[in-house]
Amino acid sequence: ILGTMVVHRKMAFFSDALGHSALTGIALGSFLGISDPSLSMVIYGIIFAMLLTIIQRRNLSSTDTIISVFASGSTAVGLAILSHGGNFSNYSALLIGDILSIQLHEVVWLLVILLLTIVFWGFAVNRLNAISVHPTLARSANIRVKLMEDIFAVLIAIVVMLSIRWIGILLISALLIIPAASSRNISRNMREYHIYAIIFAMFSGILGLGVSYYTN
């Protein structure tokens, strides 16, 4: 669901940067004594997403340049902290993820996020479309552009960070981008765009699980 708007608003690099910044969230959580890495990743991801959003609004440089600098710097800081403490080997599995490690309370959290996403999408999808087409025109229609952008960025950060433990840092961007990009090539309108993206995401997920189960 979120991937369609990520692609539509040309934020593919944004989600990729969030995924790579997870290492810093883990490192800071470990340094501060937070036992659950998911919690530290979500907190750091929200801060990182908001920081990127604020800097983008100031137009200090091109969006791709800003995201690249922050993603690289954040990843480097995370690797440095984890390597210095000798803990990197404990978290290296997060690079590729492990869906078998999912626990019941984490499934519950994912379901809660899914419901929140659906509610937000029903309320905000037309507003986000208007913002992506012409922000100034959206403001003239009394759409709170900054608020919509902030909520969307926070929602992406939460989804990305919660999914990393099972999808992996290296593949988290593909989870959002590939189904939406595939759907965009065959869709004739926004309704089909969202429906096909969901179908592609579900099909690829089930196919991937099936192939890995029968070949391993």
Where are these regions (language model features)?
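Transmembrane helix-bundle core of multi-pass membrane transporters
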Residues: 63, 67-126
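Hydrophobic alpha-helical segments embedded in the membrane of multi-pass proteins
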Residues: 19-21, 46-47, 147-158, 170-190, ...
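Helix-loop-helix "hairpin" substructures at the membrane interface of multi-pass membrane proteins
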Residues: 107-176
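Generic alpha-helical transmembrane segments of integral inner-membrane proteins
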Residues: 1-2, 43-51, 77, 111-120, ...
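Re-entrant/interfacial helical elements at transmembrane boundaries that shape
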Residues: 7, 22, 93-95, 132-136, ...
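C-terminal binding/interaction regions
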Residues: 92, 96-101, 200-216
